Structures are given as structure tokens and as C-alpha cells.
Amino acid sequence: MTESGSTASPLCGVGSSVMTETQETYQATTRVKRGLADMLKGGVIMDVVTPEQARIAEDAGASAVMALERVPADIRSQGGVARMSDPDLIEGIVNAVSIPVMAKARIGHFVEAQVLEALGVDFIDESEVLSPADYTHHINKWKFDVPFVCGATNLGEALRRITEGAAMIRSKGEAGTGDVSEAVRHLRTIRGDINRLRSLDEDELFVAAKEFQAPYDLVREVASTGKLPVVTFVAGGVATPADAALVRQMGAEGVFVGSGIFKSGNPAARAAAIVKAATLFDDPSVIADVSRGLGEAMVGINVSDVPAPHRLAERGW
């Protein structure tokens, strides 16, 4: 697999009555990838750094785990260049659990993505939590058989990542802070952008497509359906059962939890509580019950106290 070479997006020629064999193959692949992501809907995906943590997450009811060497809070506090995790660590986690395993690649680092695919992970997260490898290009995700997860702070970012082949979108939030406010803001922004599209006529949608730097057919589809064509999760700052219920009530189809579980006082109990809250998110009595006796939550940091150059959500374009 190489970086060079042209690979057309299946979005090309959507309106044509003649579909090439290549386009048919891409559309079939897209359905498979998005279908795999759709199976995680309603679930909680947890960051883990050891096979033992992965088993705790699985026992708590996690729908998938994210294998990495350092959780975002440690990446933030320790600094340095954050890269793809060691293959031995990833394989150890893959072999430890029966649920899907995700792993992170740096933005634009297509070779890290190739390695992760060779290791047999179930999803690749092209993640702003790691140090970007390319400040101009994201990975061409159509070249891979494994589905990709990508972050977004607004609809334009989400549409561009989908155009590149992402099968799942997550809000970026501000990872490693324990402050859910940015995740909430990004989710509201994406929903607000979609609502604005729905009020536009066809001519105005052409202008919107230019504004979002996304294909017109994709913009028109979102305007028609009122939602993204892929599953939308929330990530960044979810640390309590109430946080999980909050974003689920706001329309998130699932939750990523990074540092919030294994940086807390009782990881096993908190993991199970967040899973239950994400499932029964519209029942306040359940949220109250599962929030009892969990021990200390991660200390965290207010997003407003994070200097602009250190805000991970601003990585990507």
C-alpha cells in the first residue's frame, strides 16, 4: 500500500445513472464499514493501557476498547511527541478481550494506519490526541479495509472526514481534561449546522457545500435526512455517569471515555456506572442510583485553563 495513486471517493458520480464496478465496490465497502460502526451505537468505548484494564472495561459492559500507551490526561501532563502505541501492547489487548479493539494513528500518518490494520484492530482512530504527522492532509481512509473513527468540532470537519472515508464521527471535546463542556459545544455546533442546512433551498446548498468544503451530494443528503450518514459519538471530558447521560440526551449515539475511568478512585464501578447511564440516559432516578459511592472522579482541569497552543481539539482541518 502506498500513499501515491488516485483513489476516487464513492461520493463521486452519485447522481449518474451509470455506476462503474469500482464505485459499486466502494459503495459495498462503505455499507460494511458503516454497518460495523452502527453496531456500537448506544455503547461506551473506553481507553485502556493494559490487558487488565481491557478486561475490566469488557466486564463493565463496554462496547469496545481503545488500546493506547498513555491515556490523554497523561499525554497532556507528560508532553512530548505522542505516537501510535507499541504493537506488542495492542496485540496484548486484542488477545485479552472479545469485544472490538480500536487503536489510534496520528493525523495524516498513513503508515501507522497500515501497521494497525496489519495488527488486526477492528477500528482505527485518526486522532488529534496524538501529535499530527501531516499538517496538510488527513489519511485517505478509502484505501483501507478497516473502518476509521475521526473527530470533528463542526459540521464542515465532519463532512470532510466522511468524504475521506470515515465510518464514525466523534466530537473532539478536549481530551484528558475531565471537562465535558467542549464536547457539549462541539455536539451543539454540529447539530446547529445541520439544522441550518435543513432551512436552505437547493441554490443555497451549493453555497453551503463551498463553505463546508464538502461535496454537494453529501451536503444535500445531510440536509434531507437531518443527520450525518455515519454514527456520531461524543468524546472528550466525559468523566461521570451524568456526563454520559447528558450527551446521550443531547443526541449522541454513543460515548468515548478516555481518562475518566482509570484516573478515578474506583475504575470498575465507574466504568459499569457510565455504561448503565449511557444506556438508560433518560431516567434520572437510574443516573442518581449509579452515581452513588463511585469514589473520587478524576481531578481534571478546566478547559478555560488550558492555553490555546495546548488545546488538542484544534488539531485537524
From Swiss-Prot:
It catalyses: aldehydo-D-ribose 5-phosphate + D-glyceraldehyde 3-phosphate + L-glutamine = pyridoxal 5'-phosphate + L-glutamate + phosphate + 3 H2O + H(+). D-ribose 5-phosphate binds at residues 47, 176, 237, 258-259. Pathway: Cofactor biosynthesis; pyridoxal 5'-phosphate biosynthesis. InterPro entries: Aldolase_TIM, PdxS/SNZ, PdxS/SNZ_N, RibuloseP-bd_barrel. It holds the Pfam family SOR_SNZ. Keywords: Lyase, Pyridoxal phosphate, Schiff base. One of its GO terms (molecular function) is pyridoxal 5'-phosphate synthase (glutamine hydrolysing) activity. Gene3D superfamilies: Aldolase class I. PROSITE patterns: PDXS_SNZ_1, PDXS_SNZ_2. Induction: By indole. Its EC number is 4.3.3.6. The active site is at 104 (schiff-base intermediate with d-ribose 5-phosphate). D-glyceraldehyde 3-phosphate binds at residue 188. One of its GO terms (biological process) is pyridoxal phosphate biosynthetic process. Signal peptide: none annotated. Belongs to the PdxS/SNZ family. In the presence of PdxT, forms a dodecamer of heterodimers. Catalyzes the formation of pyridoxal 5'-phosphate from ribose 5-phosphate (RBP), glyceraldehyde 3-phosphate (G3P) and ammonia. The ammonia is provided by the PdxT subunit. Can also use ribulose 5-phosphate and dihydroxyacetone phosphate as substrates, resulting from enzyme-catalyzed isomerization of RBP and G3P, respectively. This is Pyridoxal 5'-phosphate synthase subunit PdxS. It comes from Corynebacterium glutamicum (strain ATCC 13032 / DSM 20300 / JCM 1318 / BCRC 11384 / CCUG 27702 / LMG 3730 / NBRC 12168 / NCIMB 10025 / NRRL B-2784 / 534). The gene is pdxS.
